[in-house]
Each structure stands twice: as structure tokens, then as C-alpha cells.
Amino acid sequence: MQDKYHLTLEQNLYLAKRNLIDSIWRSAKIEGINVTFPQTYAIIEKAAVQNVSVEDILKITNLKHAWQILIQEPEAPLTLEWLCKIHGEVAKDEALEWGKLRTGEIGVGGTDYVPPIPNADAVRVFLQQMEQIPSPTERAIETMFRLIKQQIFWDGNKRTAMLAANHIMIANGCGLILVPEKEIETSQTVLLDYYNHDTLDNAKQFIYSTCIKGIDFPERKRTQGISL
């Protein structure tokens, strides 16, 4: 799986900042939070907003704070401690515990899959294994799906996993993972199939083919295509 983009860190951070509200809005939609883009913008800008629950406002605000960490610390190593730090923002005042690994059993809606109770050492080994994947884009996508399936936290696993994936993408200049609005329903189907049948390759290909966003430089491509 080849990287689609080769941006500088500065370029990728610019991309992340430009797409901050869109990223948060799409994550909210994936989680089933019924908010519009203008409502998301208003919440992030701390403006008054109507017809949005307090719980949903909290989730969006928490996502904003988590994204701020990604932008402020783009080259921080992806460790268990970092994941807990991000989750501490994502699920603050929402999950049973935030910033700590899950210690009890949970189920996954729409599937019979029951994730095992996580072990800190096993999570660390998993993250080290992911570092061996040469392509940062593939590493980001696979890390995201495996974290989602492991459900290492009580709640907010999908949001945390997507943030972890984008952290890898940003640090390596590979663009962003953003699920287009028209593909959100398909993404849920792909994820359920992965839960039930471990169809990781299919899930990875879906994200790779439809959900990678970057900055194109047409003039650069044209120049590179000229033989001297």
C-alpha cells in the first residue's frame, strides 16, 4: 500500500487546521451525532447553538480538544500513554472512565463480537508491531481498525482510533483520513463486517480508496513529468 501524499510536516499541519471543523463534524456523524456542519462550527467557536443536546455538544467540544493535541504535538510517539492522553480528552465526562484502559466487559452494537479485556503490556506490544509496517498510510489505517476492534477503552474507541490514525498520517506527511459524508453509511457496514468476519484487508482498502485527503500540487506534477 503506497502513500498517496508526501507532504512536509508544515503542509500537513496546514491541511489539518484547514479541515479541523470538517474532521470533527465527520467524526460526529460517524458516531451518530445528529449535528449539521454549521452547528459544529458554532460549537467549536463557542457560539450559541440550538437543537443540539448537552451530551452531543460535550462530544464535539472534547473532539476539538483532542485535535488540538494532535496539532500541537504532531511528532509525539504513538504510545499507550499518548492514547490514554487523547482518550482523556475524547471521553472526558462521558465514559465510565477516561484516559484509562477498560477493566470490564462490553459489547459492540450490531454484532455478537465481544472484545477481550485489554492488557497494558499487550497494547504496547501491538503498537510496536504496528511500527514495523513500512508505509505510514497503511500503518495508520491498520492501527485504526485494530484499535477500534480491540475496544481498549470503555467508550470513545472509534474517535480515539481515528485520531491515532491521523496522528500517524500528519507526522509522516501522508495527508488525512476523512470519511466522506456520502460514504459514512458504507463505512459502518465495512466496520460491522470487520467485527464479524475479520475482513481487515477489505476494510483497509475501503479507507485507502475513498478516505485519504491531501494537498495536490498540479504544477509540481507537470514539471516532474517533463524530460530534460
Please provide the spans of the model-predicted regions.
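FIC/Doc superfamily catalytic core
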Residues: 1-228
